[in-house]
A protein has these predicted regions:
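A short, active-site helix/loop in glycosyltransferases that binds the activated sugar's phosphate group
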Residues: 109-151
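Short His-centered aromatic/hydrophobic patch
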Residues: 62-69
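A conserved mid-protein helix/loop that constitutes part of the nucleotide-sugar donor-binding site
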Residues: 169-192, 204-210, 295, 329, ...
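Conserved acidic donor-binding segment of nucleotide-sugar-dependent glycosyltransferases
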Residues: 281-294, 302-309
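Nucleotide-activated donor-binding/catalytic signature segment of Leloir-type glycosyltransferases, i.e.
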Residues: 207-230
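Short hydrophobic beta-strand element within catalytic cores of glycosyltransferases
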Residues: 262, 266-270
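Acidic donor-binding loop of glycosyltransferase active sites
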Residues: 58, 237-252, 265
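N-terminal strand-loop element at the rim of the active site
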Residues: 2-40
Length: 345
């Protein structure tokens, strides 16, 4: 409806079929031969494939961090109007980050616009503050299409019933179990929480968290494992609140907070200077607590469990905030306007 035709270029270890039709546009895939530090690297055919697509496009839209895209950006075909969405600083790979710095500086400097996903990240990212001019730097929040209304879940298939949570309040943690998610703090907070905590997802920290629960002798932490899309929405619709206790800036935004807001659920997140505190407003849509502070985290969870009226009011305001700032349509209109602004008329 906005009159923009899109093509997406990406890498995959198994890039067959090479082209996929999606609602957003055609997805074109080349082979990823290696992924050091979670950075997929392509071969000569990737450069050829990108060259063809870049020559077709009027505007190139890059995403950061992906160092292979910096290599694509030096190709002659990339000398076009271009923008970059800056998702996150490089947090963990500091040594590699120093080696990558000159190429990163060149890439950021070559962009007509660099988009931070929240005002907080634009203000607190040292890279954005040092390497991106005020004229280049824009803010467009990430958005998400509304997943509601959803079909009712049959009782026989209910994950809430299967986990034994039908008649009790619970706090939901949803997503991949990664080191920066602060889930060890959430488990520690469970010692002081008057309700059940559900960890829905799988990932590298699974065994560490299970061992921590066993070591502490906790009976109010439930591991749901990886859940389906329908199960995810059932858990979101039935939980008291969503907790995202990420303690490192690798959690640059927190899309799961938007999913909770869609379901009119309050949120609990940590003050880490990123987009999480832009989505979740302290004392309005939920609570923002200090990172790595299990007592404060437990206090916030207990307050929402004990006060259903406050929890529902915060959840209602979270839904309103989603509708005002974070829908997919709002994001699309913002990027369409940006593309127009960098394109010669």
């Amino acid at each position: 409806p906005l009159g923009i035709e899109s093509a997406v270029f990406t890498l995959s270890p198994s890039p067959l079929p090479a082209s996929l039709s999606r609602a957003e546009g055609m997805v074109h895939r080349s082979r990823s031969y290696w992924a050091p530090a979670s950075c997929d690297l392509g071969g000569p055919e990737a450069f050829r494939h990108f060259d063809q697509l870049a020559r077709w496009a009027d505007v190139l839209h890059f995403h950061f961090p992906w160092p292979f895209a910096d290599l694509l950006n030096v190709m002659p075909a990339a000398r076009k109007p271009k923008v970059m969405t800056y998702h996150s600083d490089i947090v963990k790979q500091r040594v590699l980050g120093r080696l990558y710095y000159p190429l990163m500086r060149h890439t950021l400097g070559s962009m007509d616009a660099v988009v931070a996903t929240s005002p907080a990240y634009a203000q607190t990212s040292p890279v954005l503050q040092q390497l991106v001019s005020a004229e280049q730097l824009k803010v467009i929040p990430l958005g998400m299409n509304d997943a509601l209304p959803l079909a009712a879940v049959d009782g026989a298939e209910s994950i809430v019933a299967r986990l034994g949570l039908t008649d009790q309040p619970f706090i939901l943690s949803l997503g991949v179990l990664r080191y920066y998610k602060g889930l060890h703090v959430l488990v520690e907070a469970a010692r002081h929480t008057r309700g059940t905590i559900v960890l829905a997802g799988s990932g590298p920290e699974d065994q560490n968290l299970r061992q921590q629960v066993a070591r502490l002798g906790l009976d109010n932490v439930v591991f749901a494992g990886q859940v389906s899309e329908a199960e995810k929405h059932e858990l979101l619709s039935r939980c008291t609140a969503l907790a995202l206790p990420s303690h490192l800036r690798s959690e640059a935004y927190g899309m799961v907070l938007l999913e909770a807001a869609m379901h009119s659920k309050p949120q609990i997140s940590c003050d880490i200077g990123t987009g999480t505190s832009f989505i979740n407003q302290h004392l309005d849509t939920g609570f923002v607590v200090p990172p790595e502070d299990p007592e404060s985290l437990a206090a916030a969870m207990n307050r929402l469990i004990a006060d259903d009226v406050e929890a529902q009011a915060m959840g209602h305001r979270a839904r309103q905030r989603y509708e005002q700032h974070f829908t997919g349509a709002i994001m699309a209109r913002s990027y369409a306007a940006l593309y127009q602004s960098v394109t010669p008329h």
